[in-house]
């Protein structure tokens, strides 16, 4: 029986490599052989995971993140493409500052260095307006230019293009197919994990729709915030693709191709998918959902929390539960031992 173990990070608790080491040790203690693959869709920790698949660092640059803290950012050379992970600067774990007081402006400092930008795992919910404010769009409150943070959205009365504006030619890796606005919008789906309550979600969503209309008045071809994938990284994908002209690409599919995993996924009888939380959004562009779609063998879920109504998509489900947030290693070992009992029957 050929077994594959795939792991993304367990955000806030365990890295993909830490998960794999725990599972590997438990399997080896029970004489179970398997192949192990850290995986990513271009979001949080994607640089680390790409490197574990042999991708090399091209150079390191110093850039200030969304709260002004200087970070060392690795630029990876992926088949000649220079890749940068956006969550290194705007990541959900970078700061506890209220997300309504944050935006994506800092990313303007890495644009010129990159060919491919990975989105996902962001702390921001600004529709990418912060980045646009540094790339040739001015946001006005009356006659005064204003910083387009969500806390200022209601004040924005007009948007104008200035001489700095130009289109870009870059690949943007998205970790979700969810749109910025419309049914199941990015702010609605991912806002709660970034600290937004229902009132804030509603206010930000309405203002994003209003401001995208203001932006649209500057273009003959109207930007579309309902397009698939535009919701990635709090709408940063919308700004990069619909305004700046970049190409959205599935981060998972890009990873499968560049890591060589594409040709291996269906060579296993059993696949074990490890993720911190599996829910409906996991099937809307996340790497685990993409593996599940491709895999023709038996699949098991091993992870933190399973929060999806259909449990039949896996042969069985092994969760750490809420206790996994407090003692992640201990609970993952316990869940893995239960999985071992299942696959050795």
Stretches with model-predicted labels:
Residues 2-119, 123-345:
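N-terminal loops that bind phosphate or other acidic moieties
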